[in-house]
C-alpha cells in the first residue's frame, strides 16, 4: 500500500492509517470487527468524498464503508479480499491457521504462511517482534470475519475494482471473481506476477 500511496499522492490527497491493533495503532483493546474498523475509517474521512482502497481484510472494511456511506464513496478498489464467511472459502488458509494459534503465535504463523519461513527469518528481530504482538488484532479480525458477512452486495452502489494476483492463491482469485460477478458495478483486474502481498 505504501508504494501505491506514493504514486497516488502525486495528484491526489492520500490518507493511510494503521488499523486498530497494528503498528502505530498498537496497543488496542479491540474489538476488531469490520463494523468497529469502519467506525474508525468514517471518523478519519469525515464528510469528504472518497475512493477507498483495501488490501486483503482492508477490502472488507472498504466495502462495508461504501455500503454505509453511500454516495460519499466514489469508488472502491479491493485486492484479494477474503470472503471467509462463505461456505466455499477453505478452512486451510493462512488466516484459518492463524486463528487456530495462540495470540503470541498467530501473527507469526500468518506471516510465515504468506512470505515463507526464509523471508520471515530474514526480517530484523524488532520487525518480527512487532508483527508477533499484533496477534490479538489478527485473531479478532479473522474470527469476526468468519462469523458473518460484514456487508451486502445490495448496499454497495459505487464502482468496484476487484483485484487479484496472477500468482495468488486459488481462493483469493475466486473471491475476486465472486465480487466482480455479484457487485452491481464491478470489474475484475488481474495483476501480472503478483501474489497476495501485491507488487
Describe these PLM feature segments.
Residues 1-5:
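The serine-hydrolase catalytic nucleophile loop
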Residues 6, 15-53:
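Active-site loop/oxyanion-hole signature of alpha/beta-hydrolase fold enzymes
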Residues 19-23, 83, 195-196:
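Alpha/beta-hydrolase active-site loop signature
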Residues 24, 82-90, 117-119, 170:
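A short beta-to-alpha transition loop/helix N-cap that caps and shapes the active-site region
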Residues 56:
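Catalytic nucleophile serine of serine hydrolases
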Residues 60-102:
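Flexible "cap/lid" loop of the alpha/beta hydrolase fold
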Residues 94-99, 107-120, 140-144:
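Helix-loop "lid/cap" segments that line or gate small-molecule binding pockets
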Residues 127-182, 187-190, 198-199:
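Conserved serine/cysteine hydrolase catalytic core
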Amino acid at each position: 500500500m505504501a508504494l501505491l500511496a506514493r504514486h497516488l499522492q502525486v495528484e491526489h490527497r492520500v490518507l493511510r492509517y494503521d488499523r486498530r491493533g497494528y503498528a502505530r495503532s498498537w496497543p488496542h483493546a479491540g474489538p476488531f470487527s469490520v463494523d468497529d474498523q469502519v467506525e474508525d475509517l468514517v471518523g478519519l474521512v469525515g464528510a469528504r468524498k472518497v475512493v477507498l482502497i483495501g488490501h486483503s481484510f482492508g477490502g472488507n472494511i472498504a466495502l462495508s464503508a461504501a455500503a454505509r456511506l453511500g454516495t460519499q464513496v466514489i469508488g472502491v478498489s479491493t485486492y484479494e479480499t477474503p470472503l471467509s464467511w462463505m461456505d466455499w472459502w477453505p478452512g486451510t488458509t493462512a488466516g484459518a491457521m492463524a486463528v487456530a494459534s495462540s495470540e503470541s503465535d498467530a501473527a507469526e504463523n500468518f506471516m510465515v504462511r504468506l512470505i515463507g519461513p526464509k523471508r520471515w527469518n530474514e526480517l530484523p528481530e524488532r520487525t518480527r517482534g512487532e508483527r508477533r504482538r499484533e496477534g490479538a488484532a489478527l485473531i479478532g479480525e479473522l474470527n469476526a470475519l468468519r462469523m458473518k458477512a460484514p456487508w451486502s452486495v445490495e448496499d454497495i452502489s459505487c464502482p468496484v475494482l476487484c483485484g487479484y494476483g496472477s500468482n495468488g492463491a486459488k481462493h483469493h482469485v475466486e473471491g475476486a471473481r465472486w465480487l466482480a460477478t455479484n457487485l452491481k458495478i464491478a470489474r475484475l483486474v488481474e495483476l501480472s506476477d503478483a501474489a497476495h502481498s501485491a507488487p
